[in-house]
C-alpha cells in the first residue's frame, strides 16, 4: 500500500476567526458598564473553547453507550421457574403421603453374574474340589451317601465328563499293565536295529 502525503487543513494553520466563534454573553459586573476581560479570564475562555473543539466526535468504545439505551436493556427478564430451584431433591424413594400403611418397594430380582471360566480352569477346579474328593473316598470306602451328596457328586462327575469330551481328553487306564508292557518291550528290544 502506497503512502499518501498528509495535507494540512486551514483550521490547523489559521486561528479561528471572530465570526466563527459563538457569541457569549459578557459578564456584567459593575452596574451595567461593559468592561474589558482580564488576561486570566481570556485564557480561561480560550481553554474552554479549545476543549470543546477537541471533543467534537463520539466517545470511543462500546462501553460508552447512551444511558437511555442502557436503561432499556435493564428491563427485568421473566425467569423460568424450573431453573435454579432451591428445593432439596430426596435421594431415597419415600412414601411421603402414606408412611403408615407400610408399603415397601419390591426388590428387582437381579441374576447373579457367574464368572465364566475357561474349560481348562473349570475342569481343574472340579478335579481339585475337596468336597467331591471326600465324597468319592467315602463311596470307595463303602459308606452310603445322602441324597443331596449323591446328587452333587453325580452333577460334578457329569460336568467333568462334558469338559473332558469338549477338550478331547480321554480317560487314563489306571491298570499297571501298560507300564509293565512298555518296560518288557524296552528290555527285549534289540538296540542294534537303531545303528
Curated annotation (Swiss-Prot):
Keyword NADP listed: no
Domain of life according to the entry: Bacteria
Single GO MF descriptor: GTPase activator activity
Job description of the protein: A GTPase-activating protein (GAP) that modifies Der/EngA GTPase function. May play a role in ribosome biogenesis.
The family this protein is said to belong to: Belongs to the YihI family.
Subunit structure, as described in the record: Interacts with Der.
Protein's recorded name: Der GTPase-activating protein YihI
Amino acid at each position: 500500500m502506497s503512502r499518501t502525503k498528509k495535507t494540512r487543513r486551514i483550521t490547523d494553520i489559521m486561528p479561528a476567526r471572530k465570526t466563527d466563534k459563538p457569541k457569549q454573553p459578557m459578564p456584567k459586573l459593575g452596574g451595567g458598564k461593559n468592561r474589558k476581560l482580564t488576561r486570566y479570564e481570556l485564557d480561561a475562555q480560550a481553554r474552554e473553547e479549545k476543549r470543546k473543539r477537541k471533543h467534537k466526535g463520539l466517545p470511543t468504545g462500546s462501553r460508552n453507550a447512551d444511558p437511555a439505551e442502557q436503561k432499556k436493556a435493564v428491563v427485568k427478564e421473566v425467569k423460568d421457574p424450573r431453573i435454579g430451584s432451591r428445593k432439596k431433591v430426596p435421594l431415597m424413594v419415600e412414601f411421603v403421603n402414606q408412611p403408615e400403611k407400610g408399603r415397601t418397594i419390591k426388590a428387582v430380582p437381579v441374576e447373579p453374574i457367574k464368572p465364566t471360566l475357561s474349560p481348562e480352569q473349570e475342569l481343574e477346579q472340579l478335579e481339585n474340589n475337596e468336597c467331591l474328593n471326600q465324597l468319592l473316598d467315602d463311596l470307595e470306602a463303602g459308606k452310603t451317601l445322602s441324597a443331596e451328596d449323591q446328587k452333587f457328586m453325580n452333577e460334578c462327575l457329569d460336568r467333568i465328563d462334558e469338559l473332558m469330551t469338549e477338550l478331547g481328553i480321554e480317560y487314563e487306564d489306571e491298570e499297571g499293565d501298560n507300564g509293565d508292557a512298555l518296560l518288557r518291550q524296552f528290555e527285549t528290544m534289540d538296540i542294534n536295529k537303531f545303528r
